[in-house]
């Protein structure tokens, strides 16, 4: 009941966002009015969803920017999970109380793009307020997610990530496995997971983000279409098509291993992290953005490796796709506030700022210069994990199946997939019927979004 209520609240808020933005957008644009010079520092409110070490590093960036000048004060405000933060931003905008900057996860990109007049495009912001802005300094695989077909960036990539495999090297040793040879293929992975379970662990493996990692990235890594129209990049009239024989085999294997207690389900989003950090399982799938927190919480030696692949899948491994979030700017602010936001975004894009953020958190560097600076500093010699993620993301030139995903109502679609996955584990529905249900109910949400944005 709780998940159904959450799903309904999210649906109503997203519908309110897209339809309500139309009515509020003109008023918001007109709200950028001339005002007298501020008598003190201008506060820039920055809503985010970061926790733990990542939240500390958000605050660090704000503090560092604030120390460079006296005109603006960037104030980070934690608003809960990604979905909580997005929903809070929707509600705040409709109440004319929107923050200046909001962190929105990648599944909300299509919704934000459709909200014309409610958000101020980053490329326009930087141009209007005198910032040197060169889109080519950013890594294309990342920025394409947040840009128009003309290459115009609508939001600033911030905590970009991709999914990787974490493994407990100490547990590998105990199970008689080579700690320097993590599994490369899925058949190898499942056999190692069974050995970890047999060695005395509570389970062999777990995973976060069932949709993002085991459906979306799984499809991209195997060069399979997740949806039509280049996964939504080429039009709103797209459909989900991920219920392939390969995906069916993959999910049936995991479902069976759940019955055998080799796979342990830890919950939605990133709720499975404690199963790995506490040593209950030896293998785990999570964002590279979890690297800093694992470094802080794991009391054992762990490694980072690429996602496994099925060797009989043509073209695999391909490349993974990004997750994480970008920073969007709301309309309706003063010119002084926009100048402060533009200055802050320029600060965030500096190689030194990006390299620090990347090295402290594990999130991907969004600029080539930050990556090169990190390499020159010898960071990867002692911390190879984050570079595994970068090389995996850039493994091959993206195809229409692996360039990313851009669907409307995608946060709702993910909630549908989470619920069906839990029903599969609970024995309420077969894997085959469950995947079909994910696709059919997800496609219904795509049609709703398409009708609303014709």
Ranges and model annotations:
Residues 190-196, 235-266:
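Glycine-centered hinge/linker elements that transmit conformational signals in sensory
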Residues 64-140, 174-176, 184, 282-283, ...:
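Extracytoplasmic "Venus flytrap"/periplasmic binding protein-like
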